[in-house]
C-alpha cells in the first residue's frame, strides 16, 4: 500500500470517531522507525514503519497535532533523521533527550509547551514501563509491538473515545 493510500485509510479510520485527541504523541525507536538511533549514524538514511507516514499526515490533515516523546542517548541523530524524513516542522513538540528518566518528564514538558491537557492526548510507545507511567497521568496509551500501524491506530482512537466518554474524563475537561 502506498503512502497516499495509507493516508486515505488512516483518514477513513479517523472519520469513524466523533471525538479525536487534540494531540497524538509518538515515541521514535521501534514505534515510528524500526531501529535504535544510537545504533546509526547521522549519515544513514532513516526509514519508517510502513504505516507511520500515512498516519502522521492523516492526523495533520484532520487538524490533530502530533508530538514526539523519546529517550535517546543520541538526540542529535534522532533530530537529524526527522529532518531527513521531512518531519522536522510537523511536530508541535519534540521532547527528545538523553535523560533516562520516566517519560512522564517528556509529557510534563509537552503539556507546558502545548497547553493540551493529558486527558486530551493519545500516546504510542513500544515499552510497557512507559505506557504504565504515562497512563497514570490520564493519557490514553497504546503499546505497539512492531511499530505504529493502522490496527493499533484504530485501537488507540477507540480507547481514546471510550476514555473520553467516561465520567472521569468529562470532569477533567
Which residues are covered by each model-predicted region?
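Acidic, Mg2+-coordinating phosphoryl-transfer loop and its flanking beta/alpha structural elements
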Residues: 118-164
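Metal-dependent phosphoesterase signature
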Residues: 23, 29-50
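Conserved H-loop
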Residues: 87-92, 117
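Catalytic phosphate/metal-binding cores of nucleic-acid and nucleotide-processing enzymes, i.e., regions
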Residues: 15, 42-48, 79, 83-87, ...
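Non-catalytic pre-domain segments flanking phosphatase-related domains
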Residues: 1-28, 39, 169-173
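A general structural motif
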Residues: 19-21, 63, 118-120
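Short loop-to-alpha-helix "cap/lid" segments that border enzyme active sites
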Residues: 100-113
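Substrate-recognition element of Asp-dependent hydrolases with the DxDx(T/V) motif
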Residues: 52-82, 94-100
